């Protein structure tokens, strides 16, 4: 398990010491992170090392995952997209399926922790069904710049019951009674995805795809859909070409 001291070469000793001091005030607390999957996607990738790191700092941290039917995950995928401005037909049946699955998960999960952090919209209504022993925080990982109004009107009724909301940027803040804080995500430099490649590994990949190395090289890695802004990547490439030929 990676210890916090091993991050010094990336963030500096002062930052690591500050993390230790902040963690000391939380030592002994029971914390639970709740999301919808153990693998796939950025949230799961973030929670895996974060849970281990928090435990190594003396914060008793668990990671709970809700379960659901294919219909549930189809609905929450559309909700996820609607929070980013996409269209959605939020029928009464869809709401019933969504809320029923979350209720069923509240029965299966004993969330009596001192702190609960719920990630993204999938587990959001859990707060309606669990006895609060301490603060609940909703961590929204999506772009809330211009959410679908119908979607936000529905979900905000749950959000308002939380003690705090964490969003990535100030531009994502919404009109809420609940306090909002802004916290940018980070990568784990020790994950397989982010590890440094050897020179032979790099050259092998470049040769395989026929990528020349006589010019500066920048990569953008994401799935190919509108929410990852592939058109923006092309525009960025054109701007870069104006500077580097």
Annotate each predicted stretch with a short phrase.
Residues 1-245:
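Catalytic cores of nucleotide-sugar-dependent glycosyltransferases that transfer UDP/GDP/TDP-activated
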């Amino acid at each position: 398990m990676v210890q916090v001291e091993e991050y010094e070469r990336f963030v500096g000793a002062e930052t690591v010491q500050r993390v230790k001091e902040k963690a000391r005030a939380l030592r002994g607390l029971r914390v639970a992170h709740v999301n919808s999957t153990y693998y796939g996607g950025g949230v799961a990738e973030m929670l895996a090392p974060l849970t281990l790191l928090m435990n190594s700092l003396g914060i008793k941290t668990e990671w709970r995952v809700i379960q659901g039917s294919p219909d549930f995950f189809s609905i929450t995928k559309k909700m996820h997209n609607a929070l980013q401005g996409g269209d959605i037909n939020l029928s009464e049946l869809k709401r019933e399926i969504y809320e029923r699955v979350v209720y069923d998960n509240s029965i299966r999960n004993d969330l009596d922790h001192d702190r609960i952090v719920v990630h993204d919209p999938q587990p959001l209504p859990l707060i309606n069904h669990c006895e609060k022993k301490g603060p609940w925080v909703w961590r929204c990982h999506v772009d809330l710049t211009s959410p679908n109004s119908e979607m936000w009107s529905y979900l905000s009724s749950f959000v308002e019951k939380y003690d705090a909301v964490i969003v990535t940027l100030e531009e994502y803040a919404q009109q809420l009674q609940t306090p909002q804080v802004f916290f940018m995500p980070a990568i784990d430099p020790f994950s397989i995805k982010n590890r440094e490649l050897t020179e032979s590994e790099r050259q092998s990949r470049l040769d395989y795809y026929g990528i020349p190395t006589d010019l500066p090289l920048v990569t953008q890695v994401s799935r190919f859909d509108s929410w990852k802004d592939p058109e923006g990547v092309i525009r960025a490439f054109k701007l870069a070409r104006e500077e580097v030929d």
